Amino acid sequence: MKPVFLDFEQPIAELTNKIDELRFVQDESAVDISDEIHRLQKKSNDLTKSIFSKLTPAQVSQVSRHPQRPYTLDYIEALFTDFEELHGDRHFADDYAIVGGLARFNGQSVMVVGHQKGRDTKEKIRRNFGMPRPEGYRKALRLMKTAEKFGLPVMTFIDTPGAYPGIGAEERGQSEAIGKNLYELTRLHVPVLCTVIGEGGSGGALAVAVGDYVNMLQYSTYSVISPEGCASILWKTAEKAADAAQALGITADRLQKLDLVDTVIKEPLGGAHRDFGQTMKNVKAVLEKQLHEAQSIPLADLLSRRFDRIMAYGKFSEQ
């Protein structure tokens, strides 16, 4: 797959194109230009490190939405075995913006639930661009309650712009579905591990992100509203999105300082989409450690900690 570069990555894109051209020349001729290729590769890596070491919150938001970033089904394929997808909420319909089912993690049976976006236009429409309707959240809850019944740990992957704001979704109880999930997750009698892998958009993300451990990938975001939405409300123009992103504090490192996130999972150079394999290794290492820890904590303590975590959301201090 040809890499897609964001606007602030254009200097990297130019070097990458030049490297590709030199490789083509070397393949088509007897001229050895490997030293020049290696020099440009090092220059590209150094430039990428420099750019990504000083990303603004608005740029991190762009990376979190990158079209080639790994989605929930990519993590399921890489980290789990024997995945059996489960469908439907048993009330209205099957929402393809939420995927989930039974799987094995290192041989242990677990329940996996997550948001799913699409790669191409057809799939994006089918998945509703990763924005669940009420039936999606009710499906997620049905799966998590099934996990509780059989004593299976729950692992969730969060990647959504937010809950779908359509009229039909509101008529079918969007806010009730999200609120019910928050309530039930605080009292679910099994370990719950949550990982933000892309966008963590408001209540649409929180509905599957109440857990014993909450992780974020290095270039993922988590906020009550998108920077563009915030700017449109406060300044009446989306052009102020960069200012909104700065004020919202949407980045993983900022949220970890506020004790809203347990672990920030390091991404490969250039973001998770540049090296799926390394990304999966990093995520797996964290989940292995946390699952072992969660299963060693008495259930009463686990539930108390989980409840205290969500009740701490929204607290603030004036400086």
From Swiss-Prot:
Pathway: Lipid metabolism; malonyl-CoA biosynthesis; malonyl-CoA from acetyl-CoA: step 1/1. It holds the Pfam family ACCA. The keyword Acyltransferase does not apply. GO terms for molecular function: acetyl-CoA carboxylase activity; ATP binding; carboxyl- or carbamoyltransferase activity. Its EC number is 2.1.3.15. PROSITE patterns: COA_CT_CTER. Residues 39-293 form the CoA carboxyltransferase C-terminal domain. GO terms for biological process: fatty acid biosynthetic process; malonyl-CoA biosynthetic process. It is an enzyme of class 2 (transferase). This is Acetyl-coenzyme A carboxylase carboxyl transferase subunit alpha. It comes from Neisseria meningitidis serogroup C (strain 053442).
